[in-house]
Structure formats: C-alpha cells, structure tokens
Amino acid sequence: KVVRSQIADSPIATITGLSGSLLWTGNQGEIVFDMHVGRELTGGTIEGLAPCSWFELQFKDGSKVTISGTSMLTFADIGQKKLRLKQGAFTADVVPQPVGKPMIIQTPSTVIEVVGTRFEVEALQAFTTVNVREGNVRLKHLVDGNAVDIPANYRVIAEAGGDLSPMLLPAAENYWKSQLDVQAGGFGKWLPATKKRPA
C-alpha cells in the first residue's frame, strides 16, 4: 500500500536551468537557496527573488515550465499536475496529458486547463495575460465563471469586467532598418520613422 505522504515526498521534476536569486520551499517546509541543474524536487514553491531571476523545471513526462523575474510558483503532481502562479511570468511546453487530467494552472484571477501545448502566462493581482503559441488552452475567469478556449497564435487578457475574446497575437518583426548618423562617442534618442525622416 502506498501512503500519500510517500507520494508527496517522491521527486516529481528536475531543475533543467536557473539563474539569479531563487528560493525553493519543499512540501515539508524545507527551505533551499542553493539549487543546481539536475536537482530533483518534490512539489513545493519556487520563488524568483529578483527581476533577473529565472528557473526551468522539467516534470517526469517531459513537460517543461519556466518562471522569470520576480515570480512565485507552487507545483504538485499526484496523478495530475497542479500549479499556482501567485505572481510573475510563466511559460510552459506541455506534452499531451492523460485524458481527464489536464495540467491546471491557477493565477489570482483565472484557472487555466492545459492538455498539451506551448504558451506563456503573466499573472498580476488585477489581471492575467495568456498567450498561446501551439495547441489550445482553456481559461476560466474566477470572478464571474466565464470561460474561453484560446487557440494557437491568440491571447486573452483576463481582468474584472473585461472581455474574454481571444485576440490575434502580434506578428514578430523579422526585419528592420536603422540609420545611425552619430559621431563616435555620441549619444542620441531613437525616434520612429516619419514621412519626412528615417528612424
């Protein structure tokens, strides 16, 4: 017979990348500042303590999640991955999840269900932004219970009283041109191009 506390103490993920000031608090209250790539973690809470902090975690099934900046993420996997992004920036590349057991990500204002996709989340107290790169994500607004499916290449900004309609993600710029006619050692301010002058 497997006892639930034994499951909770088993490693569920491995650190695959990190930088900056970070703090991990394990399920049993263990606090660790000295983390390294390759360390296996049970569930717990990871905190990015500085704007330059980032942390990447890979679950046993190959799904990867990353937090960056001043962020706080609690994670567990007892047959289903459940994460709580209290604040900050979060990206995920999720392999297909078992039927009926999507990855659940809760922010202060939303619940996001993921069955397998690549997406980003920014969670603040007042709103949550979800950008979907591949696959689909289901977002439920906690304030009013409204839900929306977000397809690939779309985003939703969920805020109190706001519209949950998906918006097309802006296309990435692949080409630009600049003209820097400044003497060596000179400084200037970038200005966008107008009809009368180049950028």
List PLM regions with ranges.
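Short acidic/polar, Gly/Pro-enriched loop/turn segments located at secondary-structure boundaries
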Residues: 1-129, 134-199
